[in-house]
């Protein structure tokens, strides 16, 4: 096999995927990190459904969700680096869980999760009685999650609507057909999404969200400054040890001149709050070790509110 830094882009216009391939496989990797965190002694988040979704994809995926990271027993540095990755996923999940709790507390009962993947917030969060959650993603990814959870007797904690559509297509029309009410304030989430969109598609996404948002709507976004050093090492280990080819570098768009998410939102009527992932990790007791700083991911976690009429 080639090294990850020698692989060209695997993306093409109109490409699609199942949960175990291409972008879909990244959802399994993130769910595995949530499973590791949930099994820990003092978890920041609890996602009891993540182990079910990951292990159902096969034994190699189940090993990736091993809370002891036993598949890296003879590689202490690799184990620490993978643990750091799981810590980051826990912190980002916690940030967005708190965002939804605050939105619900402010009376916002409509939520849209973009590129929902194996996100289980519709099932595991404490939603208001009238809450409606729309999950947008590729058809096969949504089908996998719904079928696995249903087979285990899991029901959603809110009214859940799966919206099977590619975010590069006319997803607003599909969302409206599914029952979305553009006159109600909405809590939007774009977590782990932006690098998988071309820059112009990211701009269109924000334009469409703004157009669909009633006053008092909110949005939360994870904005990446991709540090590939540590990530490449983690992906290589997953491939070599588990046979899992999660090559995020080849699946993302790294275009110069891409709009900064916080700046775009601020320039279009949103009031923005942002924090670096490293500040948030330190605040929650999961600081990046000094000797791993150069290998750690760098992102900005932001939330914003819309106070003006569209």
UniProtKB/Swiss-Prot annotation:
Cited SUPFAM superfamilies: S-adenosyl-L-methionine-dependent methyltransferases
Enzyme Commission number(s) of this protein: 2.1.1.-
Molecular-function GO terms, alphabetical: methyltransferase activity
Domain of life: Bacteria
Gene Ontology process terms (BP): methylation
Residues that bind S-adenosyl-L-methionine: 137, 166-167
Statement: the UniProt record of this protein carries the keyword 4Fe-4S: no
Pfam family, one: LCM
Keyword field: Methyltransferase, S-adenosyl-L-methionine, Transferase
NCBIfam families assigned: mthyl_TIGR00027
Known function: Exhibits S-adenosyl-L-methionine-dependent methyltransferase activity.
Family: Belongs to the UPF0677 family.
Stated name of the protein: Putative S-adenosyl-L-methionine-dependent methyltransferase MMAR_0356
């Amino acid at each position: 096999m080639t090294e990850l830094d020698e692989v060209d882009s695997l993306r093409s216009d109109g490409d699609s995927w199942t949960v175990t391939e291409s972008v879909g496989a990244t959802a399994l990797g993130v769910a595995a990190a949530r499973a590791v965190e949930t099994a820990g002694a003092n978890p920041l988040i609890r996602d009891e459904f993540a182990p079910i979704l990951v292990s159902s994809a096969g034994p190699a995926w189940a090993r990736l969700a091993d809370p002891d990271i036993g598949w890296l027993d003879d590689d202490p540095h690799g184990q620490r680096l993978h643990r750091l990755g799981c810590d980051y996923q826990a912190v980002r999940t916690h940030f967005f869980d708190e965002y939804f709790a605050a939105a619900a507390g402010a009376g916002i009962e409509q939520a849209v999760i973009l590129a929902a993947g194996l996100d289980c917030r519709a099932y595991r969060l404490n939603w208001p009685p009238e809450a409606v959650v729309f999950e947008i993603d590729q058809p096969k990814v949504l089908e996998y999650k719904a079928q696995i959870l249903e087979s285990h007797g899991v029901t959603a904690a809110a009214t859940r609507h799966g919206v099977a559509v590619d975010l590069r297509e006319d997803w607003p029309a599909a969302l409206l057909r599914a029952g979305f009410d553009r006159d109600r304030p909405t809590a939007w989430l774009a977590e782990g999404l932006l690098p998988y969109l071309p820059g112009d598609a990211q701009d269109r996404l924000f334009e469409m969200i703004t157009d669909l948002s009633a006053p008092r709507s909110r949005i939360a976004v994870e904005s990446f400054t991709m540090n590939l050093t540590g990530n490449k090492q983690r992906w290589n280990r997953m491939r070599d040890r588990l046979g899992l080819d999660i090559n995020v570098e080849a699946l993302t768009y790294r275009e110069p001149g891409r709009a900064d998410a916080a700046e775009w939102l601020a320039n279009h009527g949103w009031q923005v709050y942002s924090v670096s992932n490293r500040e948030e990790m330190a605040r929650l007791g999961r600081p990046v070790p000094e000797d791993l700083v150069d290998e750690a991911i760098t992102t900005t976690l932001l939330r914003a509110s819309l106070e003006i009429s569209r």
